[in-house]
């Protein structure tokens, strides 16, 4: 941020309690909240945008993956679920997850939107309804396919393998301008090419007159009668969360965009608000991800090239999406089998390796988000449905086929109970023929949804398709929690499109 952004407050700026009165208060500066803030300031509304985390500048980014996670992620990046254990990371910084994600932008496929409309009574959430909002967000962020000159070998080998097998694939569209292919998305883009919210929508909202309060934890939604009228929280010390000055914002409308885990906790902590349907915190869904390492005879140097630059959407109706992957070596090493000398030998192969992953759509695998007695970090429970487990095996088997078609000499599947290395297609058949249990896969997911789902029937959902809470006037939700089911693809662009629609509705007096 520049010095001209005088309405951006950081921790050092607070020396007393904060009192604000505004048209709209938006809780959460991630992709959805930032869109709402910018669109409403464009419409002439007074907006206060609140973020619990601090802002980061490129000089503050840390290439050390675990250290970066400890600073930018909730619970130090070590959040997991009960039940079927799955690690999941949510950001705590200005810009939210957009600061540390791979900038992947994919529109939800038609079959997903059609299912949402028919199964959840959402008649105006079809392709024709959402495309204008996708288009508006895409134009603002410069969303476009990854150009070949920044793909690097890791991404091009994926294309080579898919082409050899006749599997359709494509460059991933991303919200970047002038990407250099430095592969540092996970720890923050030092070149500022990635159009994360802190360099795109938030500055635009500031230029439009928004006030942005960072290092403020919202703890309660204030309600008068049947109407939400503001929020209460505290200034918190970055990285420790120690509270100090009280913050009160009175507003004509409250928009919760804190993410599908923090938003339901905030509602629960506010007296179980907006829960006439019983759906607040219910229906937690993930995109469980599995990754495979392939080792090639030639140098790959996987640290070079767009972090995630190529994908195949061919298997979406089979329940999974395939894509390339990169992250700091210390993060990826967690997925490698072995210990001691064996692990060191495998890690020494990194210059010849590529990592690709599959994300699974698991609509039968459900969980919940519940507030703990103290603090705002949630109690997460999630269970893998047995009928969803074969999707992971199918994804890994397909990745093995692509790796060998691209020329890999060995793949490392990261699955318990089978060989640590597979050296041929014949050996990889075990991924197709064996019956697996969920706990045998090394999975993770940062895509989470559905905990405040939208539904046309107030008895079965928290909000309507415009993000309006059924139970309270003046309260809106704009994050991936309103998805009725998982979107089958990376969720950011769909969340932003829905948030754009919600903002336009509010601006029109809704």
Would you name each region that the model predicts?
Residues 277-403, 410, 436-450, 470, ...:
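FAD cofactor-binding and catalytic pocket of flavoenzymes
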Residues 102-106, 480-493:
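Glycine-rich phosphate/pyrophosphate-binding beta-alpha loops
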Residues 1-24, 42, 500, 508-510:
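Extreme N-terminal leader/targeting segments of oxidoreductases
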Residues 67-146, 357-361, 365-366:
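Redox-cofactor-proximal catalytic regions of oxidoreductases
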Residues 30-31, 261, 482:
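Residue-level detector of alpha-helix initiation sites
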Residues 123-220, 228, 410-442:
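Conserved redox-cofactor binding core of oxidoreductases
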Residues 24-49:
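N-terminal Rossmann-like FAD-binding beta1-loop-alpha1 element of flavoenzymes
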Residues 39-42, 46, 53-58, 62-63, ...:
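Glycine-rich loop(s) and the adjacent beta-strand/alpha-helix scaffold that form part
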């Amino acid at each position: 941020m520049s010095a001209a952004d005088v309405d951006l407050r950081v921790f050092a700026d607070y020396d007393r309690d904060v009192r604000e009165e505004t048209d709209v208060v938006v809780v959460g500066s991630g992709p959805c909240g930032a869109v709402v803030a910018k669109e409403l300031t464009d419409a002439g509304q007074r907006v206060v945008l609140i973020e619990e985390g601090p802002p980061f500048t490129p000089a503050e980014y840390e290439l050390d993956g675990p250290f970066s996670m400890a600073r930018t992620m909730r619970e130090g990046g070590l959040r997991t679920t009960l039940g079927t254990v799955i690690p999941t990371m949510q950001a705590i910084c200005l810009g939210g997850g957009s600061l540390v994600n791979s900038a992947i932008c994919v529109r939800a496929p038609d079959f997903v939107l059609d299912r949402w409309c028919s199964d959840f009574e959402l008649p105006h959430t079809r392709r024709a309804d959402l495309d204008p909002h996708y288009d508006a967000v895409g134009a603002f962020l410069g969303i476009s396919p990854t150009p070949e000159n920044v793909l690097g070998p890791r991404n091009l080998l994926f294309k080579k393998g898919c082409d050899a097998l006749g599997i359709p694939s494509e460059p991933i569209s991303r919200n970047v301008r002038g990407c250099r292919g430095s592969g540092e998305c996970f720890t923050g883009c030092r070149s500022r090419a990635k159009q994360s919210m802190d360099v795109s929508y938030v500055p635009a909202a500031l230029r439009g007159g928004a006030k942005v309060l960072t290092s403020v934890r919202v703890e309660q939604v204030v309600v008068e009668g049947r109407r939400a009228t503001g929020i209460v929280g505290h200034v918190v010390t970055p990285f420790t969360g120690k509270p100090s000055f009280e913050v009160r914002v009175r507003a004509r409308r409250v928009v919760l965009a804190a993410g599908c885990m923090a938003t339901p906790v905030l509602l629960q902590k506010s007296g179980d608000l907006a829960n006439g349907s019983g759906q607040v915190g219910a229906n937690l869904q993930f995109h469980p991800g599995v990754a495979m390492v392939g080792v090639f005879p030639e140098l790959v140097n996987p640290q070079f090239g767009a972090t995630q630059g190529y994908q195949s959407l061919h298997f979406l109706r089979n329940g999974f999406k395939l894509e390339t992957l990169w992250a700091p070596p210390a993060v990826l090493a967690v997925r490698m089998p072995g210990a001691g000398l064996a692990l060191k030998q495998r890690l020494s192969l990194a210059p010849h390796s590529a990592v690709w992953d599959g994300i699974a759509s698991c609509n039968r695998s459900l969980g919940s988000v519940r507030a703990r007695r103290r603090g705002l970090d949630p109690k997460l429970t999630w269970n893998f449905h047995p009928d969803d487990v074969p999707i992971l095996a199918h994804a890994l088997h397909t990745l093995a086929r692509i790796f060998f078609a691209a020329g890999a000499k060995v793949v490392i599947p990261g699955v318990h109970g089978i060989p640590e290395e597979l050296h041929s297609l014949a050996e990889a058949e075990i991924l197709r023929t064996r019956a697996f249990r969920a706990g045998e896969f090394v999975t993770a997911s940062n895509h989470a949804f559905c905990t405040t789902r939208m539904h046309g029937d107030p008895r079965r959902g928290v909000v309507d398709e415009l993000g309006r809470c059924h139970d309270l006037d003046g309260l809106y939700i704009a994050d991936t929690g309103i998805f009725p089911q998982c979107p089958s693809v990376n969720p950011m662009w769909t969340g932003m499109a829905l948030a754009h629609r919600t903002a336009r509705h509010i601006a029109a007096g809704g």
